From Swiss-Prot:
GO terms for molecular function: nutrient reservoir activity. The keyword Mitochondrion does not apply. Residues 1-68 are annotated as: Disordered. This is C-hordein. It comes from the Eukaryota. Sulfur-poor seed storage protein. Disulfide bonds: none annotated. The lineage of its organism: Eukaryota, Viridiplantae, Streptophyta, Embryophyta, Tracheophyta.
Length: 68
């Protein structure tokens, strides 16, 4: 039994090239564009715009002076 040759001949297995791994994946190929977050970049409008100083009504001031 040790002398009996292997029935399976050492025939070279034809390596058929797999086409799917060779072609590059398109999603992996193209670089992902890093879109910058707009919310932190754009300044908050409420602190940015200066608060308009309301002009003092003269009648209110006059009333205060009159009361004194």
């Amino acid at each position: 039994y040790p002398q009996q040759p292997q029935p399976f001949p050492q025939q070279p297995i034809p390596q058929q090239p797999q086409p799917y791994p060779q072609q590059p994946q398109p999603f992996s190929q193209q670089p992902i564009p890093q879109q910058p977050q707009p919310y932190p970049q754009q300044p908050q409008p409420f602190p940015q715009q200066p608060i308009p100083l309301q002009p003092h009504q003269p009648y209110t001031q006059q009333t205060i002076w009159s009361m004194v």
